[in-house]
Amino acid sequence: YNLFAHTLPDFGIETTFVDPTKGSSVFEGAIRENTQLLYIETVGNPNANLIDIGAVAEIAHKHGIPLVVDNTFATPYLVRPFEFGADIVVHSATKFIGGHGTTLGGVIVDSGKFDWAASGKFPWLVEANPSYHGLSFTRDVGAAAFVTYVRAVILRDLGATLSPCLLYTSPSPRDGLL
């Protein structure tokens, strides 16, 4: 909540909050012309709300935007959001992956199914990137465009990655973690 309500506005990013207990249609009513994505949790924190992932995915795709699902609480063992139409799934490493709040980090998993070029809302993935000699992530990387952009640009420029020592002490498999 704090990320969307307090931190992102400092960067000019607006968030529209909806009451998920009112059903999936509230998501459609909140979509504006500049909406970039829909973001839900498989199990809402702190109220344990459950959302129809498939219905929200249909709404998002109808409007040419991806559905991002925070699956931290449910874990991939219990819920696999890609099977219901999610485009990106995120997990907080602080909770179940790291164990007891000793790890500050997260995991981003991209289904590779969302067409980032179709809606015209994601020029940073479609247009030539001068810092990568004109590479277009959608054209040159294809299905892995988003997650490659996160790794190649966001991690490079913002440094949001686990330290080698912390990664080594994590009980999770280490290959491919960001």
Q: Which residues does each PLM region occupy?
A:
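PLP-dependent aminotransferase-like
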Residues: Y1-T42, E58, K62, P76, ...
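Glycine- and other small-residue-rich loops at beta-strand/loop junctions that grip anionic moieties
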Residues: T16, N45-N49, V69-N71, G159-L162
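Fold-independent oxyanion-binding glycine-rich loops
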Residues: V18-T21, I40-V43, I65, V69-T72, ...
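Active-site core of PLP-dependent enzymes with the aminotransferase class I/II
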Residues: V43-P66, A74-R80
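Active-site PLP attachment segment
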Residues: A86-T148, A160-L167
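A short glycine-threonine-serine/GTX helix/turn-capping micro-motif
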Residues: Y149-L162, R174
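Conserved small/polar residues in nucleotide/adenosyl-binding loops
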Residues: Y168-P173
